[in-house]
């Protein structure tokens, strides 16, 4: 009887010791792989960004007279990476030298390449808002003007965004120089300018306009990605598509 009881106690001690030392018995972090997973703090981390919806933009303009608004084009209204990707493969596969090649700009803006660009849903919603209000809409792009003076980007935008003839303004090709868009924003008295790049926001402020950020699509070929809200500007929610 004593021997049986002693054996039982020994078995209990051994079982308990095994339970304590077992790596699968209790929740531990020892088996986690480095750089995988996230803590709850990381999952719920928020950045101090002034998010705004298109509905809120509409509400802020309610009851106001028509204004002049400006739009950047690439990654703001159009997901144009397909055209830029093709241009890179054609003119400089191993570098971004194609962006300084006038032949590329001639091709992308006057040879129908933008028919392969995808109009963004957020762009369509913003365009519909401003056209319904009777606002004057201007397209100011950082692309250089085609050397032959002919472009088909205006027609592409007209078709993609269903812009009536009496509300259509031709695309302004501001070019790539520093602050290139500022003079056109001032010339056309732009009140709000929508763009995806830091330069868009900064140019708008230099021109006395409000720059509102539109999110650049994650799969854009235009890298590096900007830091949205970096200047305290309003950022359109869900505008990456």
From Swiss-Prot:
Its EC number is 3.1.3.2. Residues 1-27 form the signal peptide. The active site is at residues 72, 74. One of its GO terms (cellular component) is outer membrane-bounded periplasmic space. It is found in: Periplasm. Gene3D superfamilies: HAD superfamily/HAD-like. Its cofactor is Mg(2+). Pfam families: Acid_phosphat_B. The keyword NAD does not apply. GO terms for molecular function: acid phosphatase activity; metal ion binding. It is an enzyme of class 3 (hydrolase). It catalyses: a phosphate monoester + H2O = an alcohol + phosphate. Dephosphorylates several organic phosphate monoesters. Also has a phosphotransferase activity catalyzing the transfer of low-energy phosphate groups from organic phosphate monoesters to free hydroxyl groups of various organic compounds. Belongs to the class B bacterial acid phosphatase family. This is Class B acid phosphatase.
């Amino acid at each position: 009887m004593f021997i049986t009881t002693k054996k039982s106690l020994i078995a209990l001690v051994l079982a308990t010791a095994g339970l304590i030392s077992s790596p699968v018995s209790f929740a531990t972090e020892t088996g986690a792989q480095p750089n995988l997973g996230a803590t709850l703090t990381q999952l719920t981390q928020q950045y101090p960004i002034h998010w705004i919806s298109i509905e809120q933009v509409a509400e802020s303009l309610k009851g106001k007279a028509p204004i002049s608004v400006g739009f950047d084009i690439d990654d703001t209204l159009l997901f144009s990476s397909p055209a830029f990707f093709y241009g890179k493969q054609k003119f400089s596969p191993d570098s971004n030298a194609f962006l300084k090649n006038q032949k590329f700009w001639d091709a992308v803006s006057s040879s129908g390449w933008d028919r392969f660009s995808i109009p963004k849903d957020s762009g369509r919603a913003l365009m519909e808002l401003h056209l319904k209000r009777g606002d004057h809409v201007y397209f100011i792009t950082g692309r250089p003007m085609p050397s032959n003076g002919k472009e088909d980007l205006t027609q592409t935008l007209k078709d993609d965004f269903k812009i009536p003839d009496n509300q259509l303004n031709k695309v302004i090709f501001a070019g790539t120089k520093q602050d290139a868009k500022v003079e056109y924003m001032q010339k056309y008295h732009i009140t709000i300018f929508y763009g995806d790049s830091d330069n868009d926001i900064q140019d708008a402020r230099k021109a006395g306009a409000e720059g509102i950020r539109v999110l650049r699509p994650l799969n854009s070929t235009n890298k590096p990605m900007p830091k949205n809200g970096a200047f305290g500007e309003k950022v359109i929610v869900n505008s990456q598509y």
